[in-house]
Swiss-Prot record:
<keyword id="KW-0050">Antiport</keyword>
<dbReference type="InterPro" id="IPR004670">
    <property type="entry name" value="NhaA"/>
</dbReference>
<keyword id="KW-1003">Cell membrane</keyword>
<keyword id="KW-0813">Transport</keyword>
<feature type="transmembrane region" description="Helical">
    <location>
        <begin position="60"/>
        <end position="80"/>
    </location>
</feature>
<dbReference type="InterPro" id="IPR023171">
    <property type="entry name" value="Na/H_antiporter_dom_sf"/>
</dbReference>
<feature type="transmembrane region" description="Helical">
    <location>
        <begin position="155"/>
        <end position="175"/>
    </location>
</feature>
<feature type="transmembrane region" description="Helical">
    <location>
        <begin position="295"/>
        <end position="315"/>
    </location>
</feature>
<keyword id="KW-0472">Membrane</keyword>
<dbReference type="Pfam" id="PF06965">
    <property type="entry name" value="Na_H_antiport_1"/>
</dbReference>
<feature type="transmembrane region" description="Helical">
    <location>
        <begin position="265"/>
        <end position="285"/>
    </location>
</feature>
<feature type="transmembrane region" description="Helical">
    <location>
        <begin position="126"/>
        <end position="146"/>
    </location>
</feature>
<feature type="transmembrane region" description="Helical">
    <location>
        <begin position="334"/>
        <end position="354"/>
    </location>
</feature>
<dbReference type="GO" id="GO:0006885">
    <property type="term" value="P:regulation of pH"/>
</dbReference>
<keyword id="KW-0739">Sodium transport</keyword>
<feature type="transmembrane region" description="Helical">
    <location>
        <begin position="95"/>
        <end position="115"/>
    </location>
</feature>
<dbReference type="GO" id="GO:0005886">
    <property type="term" value="C:plasma membrane"/>
</dbReference>
Amino acid sequence: MAIHKIRAFFNLEASGGIVLALAAIAAMIIANTSLNTWYESFIHAPVAIQIGSFSIAKDAHHWINDGLMAVFFFLVGLELKREVLIGELSNVKQIILPAGAALGGMIMPAIVYLFFNYNEPEFWRGWAIPAATDIAFALGILSLLGNRVPNSLKVFLVSIAIFDDIGAIIIIALFYTNDLSLGSLAIAGLCLPFLYLLNRRNVTSITPYLLIGVIMWVAVLKSGIHATLAGVVLALFIPLFDRTDPEHSPLEELEHDLQNTVSYGILPLFAFANAGISLKGAGFGELFHSVPLGIAAGLFIGKQVGVMLMCWLIFKLGISTMPKGMNFKQIYGAALLCGVGFTMSLFIGGLAFAGETPLFDERLGIIMGSIVSGIAGYMMLKATLKDEVNVTSVDLTRHS
């Protein structure tokens, strides 16, 4: 009986978001109790890998953020490739609206953040933190509404998140890269022809790709570019189809194999390692510092304004039309859910303010903005979709 209940839970579309939320809540509770010492020891525990004279030594926190999150970005890359080649993003007309919405949803939060910090140039580097959307949380919240949610709304939200991920990848590569090591970068670059050759020769075994991918990840890690980007690049070379057997898709097979590991292992572990905010001794200044306030306002206000403004502009100019089965109220609900930045915002925040002084904690703003956006989006869509159901039932009665 218990096993059936566990299986039923993991079959829920919302289960990934629920596990992620529980991991974050657990981290916050532990960080504010006597267990905080254990928590700090866990995330700062030294972990080293040594092969001969070569070694990589980092603490657990960095291994999670640089290593395990590379697997997450690898999965994101696989999803991007599939969607662009055969999915929702394969048609130019289909991608204009979510692409525009994602662009607006990245620009406006950054503007809001910079408005809050315009007198503090040293904090400007946090501008990209509220530009992100956490698709696991957003879809988890959306799935709580059950089968009332039209498929077009799910596709719209997922498409925005995909373009959001593309934007985040570009931002990390361009703005959060340290001093470059050209030698390491050259080694990473040398991996690309080998990956291309494997793809062109229709090598469908994943093992050689992963072996080269590990070498590329180490080189990128040493180069100064964030190591997670190696995961995205590797994903682009995984074959979508086996040319000798069109029914076999190595990419989709790998995507399926990684989904549960990422959703129920890597992302919750990342949330646990990054959301442990200790509020002991935190005063008014720390809680209402311009950085966390700017992030929270960027996620809640900037996201919805940016997404809605771009959608309105696209409709007004006749560039695209309203997706079938959707209306402006539903788009607004989706725009609110886009303000749930959690995972990617925490990730970018760790890059922007690594080793920052205790004047503020950017994670407070991420959590505040994400919670308010999630609740507001859920309430808006619950009311809107309920209205839609009621309208439908009235129409059916009228025509009977």
